[in-house]
Amino acid sequence: MAPDHPVYRLILDRALSGSHPELRRDKYKLGLVIEGGAMRGVVSAGMVAGLESLGLRRVFDVVYGASAGAFNGAYFLAGQAAFGTTIYYENLNTKNFINFWRLFQGKPVVNLEYVLKKVLVEEKPLHWPSVLNSPIPLKIVVSSLKMLKPVLLSGFKNKEELFEALYATAKMPLLSGGPVEIGGDRFLDAGLFQSIPVFAALEDGCTHMLILLTRPQGSRRKKSTLWDKYLFARLINRWQKGLGDCYLRMPDTYNECLSFIDQKEKDQERGPFLISLSLPADYLPLSRLEKNAELLRRAATESQNLVCRILQNRL
């Protein structure tokens, strides 16, 4: 992408002028949009670590996170992005988090309680007061079962509200159990409706967006399988009528979002302005349940280096 892209220009102008969220000299709203994807989230974790190393946190006005991307956004706003990246290859890649044997015990394969109660509190403690007090709000995308659409959760008043939203956005259907109840609604993983919270950021008024993708450049999701259609969708539909159809549309919804990003990236004349960062097309995609520490660590390093290489040359 051209070095004079409007998103890069805004990041550069704000970085060099010392602009910060509480004293902006421009009229724009720059959002950091972070994709998740379970263990693929290590990619966007490495990217926010790169932004942190360049001292670029203060150039953003809002951070939007979906699924694992919300966790990465929280560590980023706490000033712990590099620290937070290590959870993928030191904590989450263990049987404490992913354990297929739990199926035989009638329990979810993915143990989110371990993340919220152990990793974020004891093993790799998130400094949550910094997230709550940040002048840059964290807005977390979740999937509402009541409305069958994505919803933004924000304005967290305490640790419990923040962790509850993180729990909901990462609640993968079936793999990590059933819906999470918050305020009279039930929520599941953001990926049901919006794995990449671009449209949420647009509706929230962003004029510029830096989008961190966790799949290699040019990747697209494959169509739903017969297993999806005749088993998983029917199971999920028990939670809410119509939810199974939403589940089956996930690949199309995701691919349409990527096509929209591709189209908008090329338009440097009319806003809103979007630009995305992703690993090269020939990079081997990670599984969302990847447990190989070496592959995860390498993905984090490559992603951090990518961000530094692209943005450092412009600063």
What does each of the following model-derived ranges do?
Residues 1-63, 74-315:
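Patatin-like phospholipase
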